[in-house]
Amino acid sequence: MASIKEIKTQITSVVNTKKITKAMEMVAISKMRKTEERMSSGRPYSEIIRKVINHVAQGHLEYKHSYLETRKIKRIGLIIVSSDRGLCGSLNSNLFRKVLFKIQNFTQKNIPCDLILFGLKSLPVFKLCENNILSKITHLGEHPNILKVINGIDVLLKKYQIKRIDKIFIAYNEFHNKMSQYPKIIQLLPLSRIKSETISTKRWDYLYESESKLIIDSLFKRYIESQVYQSILENIASEHAARMMAMKTATENSTERIKELKLLYNKVRQATITQELTEIIAGASAVSTG
């Protein structure tokens, strides 16, 4: 049985750990709320630019952008968004499991995959795919730099435009609420047209400041970039939510462990006192009988 001193040391250690996990939980809550606000404010931009693309495309039916072109799949691109830090439960491992299953399915069909990796946690997992990794983007922080994101995916988009890649997916953790985050893989390219009653079937005539093709190309590129950026924000919000829950669980476990150690401390202390009293009584009896 552990001594009283050892138990007191354990209690102190667990109490200090509890303080750390509680602080990390509060920090994660604050960061999650801020990221959630940025994520919510970015959604209307993606929706509006998608509607603009559809309106403009209807005005130029003779021009079919490569982002709308469906091709026979010979090679795919996969953008994987993970976190830079750990202590967020099974968030990353669940995503990687889904991605690896996706890659395995394409590999069985003899379709190679080119990868773009976001986040430090993805690097060791896909180390064996080093020859297929086009770029690695890490340390994005709480406020991802849009230029850093664009530069990271640019090589993949160029390969798609010259038909060296036929389909592009992005894998990330979708944020639902602080309790629920789900790994998700969606198709980025080719784009599918919006089927909505809000989009009129009427053909529109537009006046352009410069060549219409350049404007349409720019709109398509901006839309894909906004989708990737939005996915990164979703993943960051999911990371903070998962870390908040992990730290909350750790704090609760620490509280339970402290209760157990205090109970053990009292038992050991009581046993020690009882033993000392027994020894004193035995000594006194020996003296009186001697």
Curated annotation (Swiss-Prot):
Recorded coiled-coil stretches: none
Listed GO CC annotations: plasma membrane; proton-transporting ATP synthase complex
CDD domains on file: F1-ATPase_gamma (cd12151)
Cellular localization per UniProt: Cell membrane
Listed InterPro entries: ATP_synth_F1_ATPase_gsu (IPR035968), ATP_synth_F1_gsu (IPR000131), ATP_synth_F1_gsu_CS (IPR023632)
Keywords attached to this entry: ATP synthesis, Cell membrane, CF(1), Hydrogen ion transport, Ion transport, Membrane, Transport
Alphabetized GO MF terms: ATP binding; proton-transporting ATP synthase activity, rotational mechanism
Keyword Ion transport: yes
GO BP annotations, alphabetical order: proton motive force-driven plasma membrane ATP synthesis
Membrane topology according to the record: Peripheral membrane protein
Keyword Cytoplasm: no
Function: Produces ATP from ADP in the presence of a proton gradient across the membrane. The gamma chain is believed to be important in regulating ATPase activity and the flow of protons through the CF(0) complex.
Family: Belongs to the ATPase gamma chain family.
PANTHER family: ATP SYNTHASE GAMMA CHAIN, ATP SYNTHASE SUBUNIT GAMMA, MITOCHONDRIAL
Assembly mode: F-type ATPases have 2 components, CF(1) - the catalytic core - and CF(0) - the membrane proton channel. CF(1) has five subunits: alpha(3), beta(3), gamma(1), delta(1), epsilon(1). CF(0) has three main subunits: a, b and c.
Official protein name in the record: ATP synthase gamma chain
Taxonomic source organism: Buchnera aphidicola subsp. Diuraphis noxia
Lineage, opening ranks: Bacteria, Pseudomonadati, Pseudomonadota, Gammaproteobacteria, Enterobacterales
Gene field: atpG
